[in-house]
């Protein structure tokens, strides 16, 4: 079986990227993915300006300066200083001609129209120089960038009122199983409420660049599954199916997908989540998630969501799930697990750095363990874990 990281790379490399674009107003672009790099239209800052409230001075060799005027933000006058002169200046105001430095207000003393300084002024201090952040023509935001609040602000600072973004990725979500019922139904004997589909839909709702299609619950009927997936593929860029992808006689998603298209890979050497797979129906990408709730959650967070982000236009490196290092506050000796395991755990910060410890409830059906967990702890297969060893963890 393919290892997790091999599978993740293959899945993302094979993602069918959306090509359709649209232009949206800047105030509606938050959370979308940029489809065309944008270029700085002007230097930033556009002019030399003061970094703080204080006094602009001319003459670093002076011990006192004579005050002549005041420069405020938005003042359009061309102001000039002569040697031995100073000017009251406010943050963001244009720097007067011949200014050597701006002295912060806290380091000055004013008596009448005479300014003195309690510290030695340094050339160019507290002056923001034109173009020190960006030069006109520099790349402001690259194609594939997620338009978060910072990116929106940066685009606005250069006068952009509209941006070209990728159209929303249409994603259909299904669960399968005769035992599943929706939350508004009365449970019969041996039935359970469908938790996977609401969970997956909730994961997707945080992504503005995805248009969610709730496909509902599919029965364990090959004809119905095949017909439903065939229709969904004509209206979706991607399909997510939880359940029905294992090896049982009632696991009918695989044969349905084989009839309609192809299965490109099935099974990864991970726990939970071994039955994870992917394929396609025409141009529509299909991901097969395990039916056990924790396995479905883990594979969707670590594999499904990165694949969808890549398909939606993000760069692969940006789409990869966030991870960092933390010390093991536990040990596994010996570790006989033949698959890479992602334990649900909690994080604590100590004087020795961040530490992680697994929760007690690790069953792939125990969703409460995910609710109480802060991270997924990456445990390599057949590798002993020592107390204090650095491990990779994924926040959830």
Predicted region positions:
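Flexible glycine/proline-rich
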Residues: 22-27, 134, 258-396
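Short, low-complexity N-terminal leaders and the immediately following helix N-cap/first helix
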Residues: 1-66, 309, 314-342
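Short beta-strand/loop turn elements enriched in aromatics
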Residues: 25-26, 44-66, 101-113, 314, ...
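Solvent-exposed alpha-helices and their adjacent loops that cap or buttress functional pockets
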Residues: 48-50, 59-60, 78-82, 95-96, ...
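Short, glycine/charged-enriched hinge/interface segments at domain edges or termini
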Residues: 56-214, 376
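Helix-rich terminal scaffold detector
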Residues: 4, 163-289, 293-299, 303
């Amino acid at each position: 079986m393919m290892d997790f990281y091999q599978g993740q790379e293959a899945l993302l490399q094979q993602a069918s990227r959306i090509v359709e674009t649209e232009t949206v107003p800047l105030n509606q672009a938050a959370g979308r993915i940029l489809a065309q790099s944008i270029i700085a239209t002007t230097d930033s800052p556009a002019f030399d300006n003061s970094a703080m409230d204080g006094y602009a001075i001319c003459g670093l060799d002076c011990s006192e300066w004579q005050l002549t005027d005041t420069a405020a933000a938005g003042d359009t006058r061309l102001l000039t200083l002569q040697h031995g002169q100073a000017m009251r200046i406010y943050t963001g105001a244009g720097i007067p001609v011949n200014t050597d430095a701006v002295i912060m207000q806290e380091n000055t003393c004013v008596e009448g129209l005479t300014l003195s300084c309690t510290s030695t002024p340094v050339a160019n201090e507290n002056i923001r120089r034109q173009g020190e952040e960006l030069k006109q023509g520099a790349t402001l935001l690259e194609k594939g960038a997620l338009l978060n609040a910072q990116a929106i602000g940066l685009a606005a600072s250069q006068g952009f009122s509209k941006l070209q973004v990728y159209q929303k990725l249409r994603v259909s979500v299904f669960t399968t199983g005769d035992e599943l019922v929706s939350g508004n139904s009365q449970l019969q004997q041996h039935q359970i409420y469908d938790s996977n589909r609401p969970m997956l839909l909730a994961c997707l709702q945080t992504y503005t660049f995805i248009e969610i299609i709730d496909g509902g619950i599919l029965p364990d009927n090959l004809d119905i599954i095949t017909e439903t997936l065939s229709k969904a593929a004509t209206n979706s860029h991607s399909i997510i199916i939880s359940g029905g992808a294992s090896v049982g006689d009632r696991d009918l998603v695989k044969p349905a997908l084989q009839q309609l298209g192809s299965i490109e890979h099935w099974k990864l050497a991970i726990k939970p989540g071994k039955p994870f797979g992917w394929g396609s129906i025409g141009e529509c990408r299909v991901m097969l998630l395990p039916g056990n709730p924790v396995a479905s959650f883990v594979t969707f967070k670590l594999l499904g969501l990165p694949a969808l982000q890549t398909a939606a236009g993000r760069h692969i490196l940006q789409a990869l799930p966030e991870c960092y290092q933390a010390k093991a506050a536990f040990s596994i000796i010996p570790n006989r697990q033949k698959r890479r395991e992602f334990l649900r755990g909690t994080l604590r910060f100590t004087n020795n750095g961040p530490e992680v410890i697994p929760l007690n409830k690790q069953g792939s059906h125990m969703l409460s363990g995910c609710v109480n967990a802060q991270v997924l702890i990456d445990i390599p297969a057949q590798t002993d874990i020592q107390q204090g060893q650095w491990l990779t963890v994924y926040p959830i």
